[in-house]
Regions:
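Aspartic protease catalytic domain
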Residues: 2-31
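Short, positively charged, Gly/Tyr-enriched micro-motifs
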Residues: 32-45, 52-61, 263-330
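Long amphipathic alpha-helical coiled-coil/heptad-repeat bundle
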Residues: 32-190
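A conserved ligand/cofactor-binding region detector
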Residues: 32-33, 38-52, 63, 67, ...
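Structured, charged N-terminal subsegments at the starts of enzyme catalytic cores
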Residues: 194-299
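Catalytic or ion-translocation cores adjacent to nucleophile or general acid/base/metal-coordination motifs
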Residues: 298-336, 366-484
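Structured nucleic-acid-interacting core domains from mobile-element enzymes and related host factors
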Residues: 328-365
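Long, compositionally biased intrinsically disordered regions
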Residues: 461, 468-641
Length: 641
């Protein structure tokens, strides 16, 4: 049995919530056969130290990294041409002192009165300015993020308002879906919100909320169950059985003959399309299946490594991938079979994690959600016709929300979308506001919807059943004051002069948000409240969102299947290489989806000619994401020219 002192030790840690064990007679053999008691005591001691560190004030440990700050900070500050808003002028004075070596720990006017830094700075020895230097750099970082400090001639860290389109260009753009006068927008939204709150109140009293209820001020809503009709799965299997097996090389040739996507890869100097189509498709295939050019040269019967390198350097770049993808997506949308799945006016977006090499650039970060291995995310937009019309590489730890509008506005396919679905990770009030102003119906599946608060223009006038759900009052005055700049933000996003994610990240970056960011959040709260009421009362909206998100998640499985080489890891060490790898993977997925859509359509047409009519309701559940009939492995042989 476990010695008494050890059992007491385990019980004490169990009370702290650190471990949970059965009585000694049960757990003794399990521990002995595992790490052993010595190993357990080591793990408990390590957990105790980690718990104490995590519970401690982080500022007690920042001096441990002081040497890293000193390695780059003085040179960096000498090179940067900084500008600041009035609120950040005290910080700029402290930066100037640090830059010139006049480190004065008494210069603390840049700190907020309630800042924890004051207590830690007072505890430092006289003449020790190390913690003060770190405080200046931390606050400089936050000021960059909030836009209170900016760099001249910088696109990412420049003055946000200088990057926005001028006010007179708003009316000329014609892309905004809201009135130019804030009074009109506020009057419309107040009338609409009051009406929808009354409708929700009546449904709550009558008990007619679909799959949900509001009881004692608490919202309850059930998750929709899958609603695939009987026979859909059998139909999918039957249709795919009639598609002949094919090699990926033959598939690429057939899709290029139908779409001409290789024409998009023009010479960087002359602008002429690549004359060596087979070589170009070898390069695209090497990126798409995550094989790499050197191993592709060993696996193909047509080109050497140096020939593939030459083609890749002169013809393959990001814009070429975007053009080729647009050609394939447009061609797939024109196929008759695609109409059974949708009209190309709704889409879903989601991030997919890929393990990356330890020695890459800044994209390779550890996100505990995916384990302890560094990686990156491919954030993709998939239309209701299954076409992956946009993808981009983002850090594994980044919020997905700011990138939603990038995929919708940075290419033509996204501009046809009217309703955008996403999961909880893609939702913020800023995104709700920007999507509504630009005319998109933003419909996220919010995991903890019952805990989210509604907002009203007049909370006291809300139905009694709903008052416990009201989180606050909409600040109309703040919206009115900032309406011109809100429209400038939206017009700038629509014009494509600045990436939407760049603007939204900056607005959301700082805890003490500036008034413009807060005003945009107020607009988003109004739009989110309207959406939440729609979601609660409309089971069909919930079902559409579920179907859209399922299409995106199924698309992830196809990408996993085609990127099987190198264990699915993205081992490129540069951000550019990672981008090309993900872009190649997305293009190859789109090519397979086009080919499957074409072949499924041919099978359906043949059955129709034979007098066998298939139900459109069943065909809507057929997916072009199958790959079992495609030979992705082995040697990649092409017909001789």
């Amino acid at each position: 049995k476990m010695p008494a002192f050890e059992w007491v030790h385990v019980q004490l840690h169990q009370q702290k919530g650190m471990i949970s064990l059965s009585p000694p007679t049960i757990c003794n053999s399990a521990i002995a056969s595992g790490s052993g008691w010595d190993g357990l005591k080591t793990l408990v001691a390590m957990a105790t130290r980690l718990t104490a560190t995590m519970a401690d004030d982080p500022l007690n440990h920042v001096l441990d990294g002081y040497h890293r700050f000193r390695r780059y900070a003085p040179r960096m500050l000498r090179l940067l041409d900084l500008r600041a808003a009035p609120v950040a002028l005290p910080l700029l004075e402290a930066v100037t002192a640090l830059r010139t070596g006049l480190n004065d720990a008494a210069m603390t006017s840049f700190l907020r009165p309630s800042s924890k830094w004051h207590r830690h700075l007072r505890a430092q020895r006289a003449g020790d300015a190390r913690l003060w230097e770190i405080a200046v750099l931390f606050h400089l970082r936050d000021a960059f993020r909030s836009g209170d400090v900016w760099l001249t001639r910088s696109r990412r860290y420049g003055d946000l308002k200088h990057a926005l389109v001028p006010a007179q260009a708003i009316a000329e753009g014609g892309r905004l879906a809201v009135p130019l006068r804030p009074e009109e927008w506020l009057a419309d939204r107040q009338a609409r919100l009051d009406m929808r709150l009354r409708e929700l109140g009546r449904a709550a009293r009558a008990g007619t909320i679909p799959g949900g209820s509001i009881e004692n001020g608490v919202l309850h809503i059930e998750k929709l169950e899958a609603a695939a009709p009987t026979g859909a799965e059998d139909l999918v299997l039957d249709l795919y059985k009639q598609i002949p097996p094919t090699r990926i090389t033959d598939l690429l040739l057939e899709v290029d003959a139908a779409t001409g996507f290789t024409e998009a890869f023009t010479h960087l100097r002359t602008g002429a399309p690549c004359a060596d189509r087979i070589g170009l498709m070898n390069v695209i295939l090497a990126e798409g299946i995550n094989l790499g050019l050197r191993k592709m040269a060993d696996a193909t019967n047509t080109h050497t490594f140096w020939e593939l390198i030459r083609i890749g350097r002169w013809h393959v770049e990001g814009e070429a991938y975007d053009r080729a993808l647009a050609m394939v997506v447009e061609a797939q949308a024109a196929l008759p079979m695609a109409r059974f799945w949708g009209m190309g006016t709704s889409a879903s977006s989601d991030g997919q994690f890929f393990v990356a090499t330890e020695q890459g650039e800044a994209m390779n970060l550890v996100n505990a959600k995916y384990g302890n291995t560094p990686g990156l995310k491919a954030y993709s937009h998939v239309s209701d016709q299954y076409a992956p019309f946009a993808t981009q590489v983002i850090p594994a730890t980044a919020s997905e929300a700011p990138y939603i509008l990038d995929g919708l506005l940075m290419n033509d396919a996204g501009r046809h979308i009217r309703e955008q679905f996403t999961d909880t990770g893609g939702f913020t009030d800023h995104v709700f506001a920007a999507c509504a102003i630009l005319g998109y119906r933003f419909a996220p599946r919010i995991r903890d919807l019952p805990s989210k608060r509604l907002y009203a223009f007049n909370p006291s006038a809300a139905p009694a059943h709903l008052r416990a759900l009201i989180g606050g009052k909409v600040n109309q005055a703040m919206i009115e004051r900032n309406w011109p700049d809100i429209l400038r933000i939206a017009a700038t996003i629509a014009a494509g002069t600045v990436a939407p994610s760049q603007i939204l990240r900056k607005l959301a970056s700082y805890p003490r948000q500036n008034e413009l960011a807060t005003a945009l959040r107020e607009v988003g709260r109004v739009e989110r409240t309207l959406f939440m009421i729609d979601w609660i009362l409309d089971a069909e909206l919930q079902r559409r969102a579920q179907i859209g998100l399922n299409k995106g998640e199924a698309h992830h499985a196809l990408k996993r299947a085609i990127s099987f080489h190198r264990r699915g890891e993205i081992r490129d060490r540069s951000a550019e290489g990672q981008h090309y790898r993900i872009a190649g993977m997305n293009l190859l997925a789109a090519i397979i989806i086009f080919w499957n859509t074409m072949k499924l359509g041919e099978v359906v047409a043949n059955q129709k000619r034979d007098g066998k009519l298939l139900s459109p309701d069943l065909l809507a559940h057929v997916s072009p994401l199958g790959w079992e009939h495609i030979n992705l492995t082995g040697e990649y042989r092409w017909p001789k020219p």
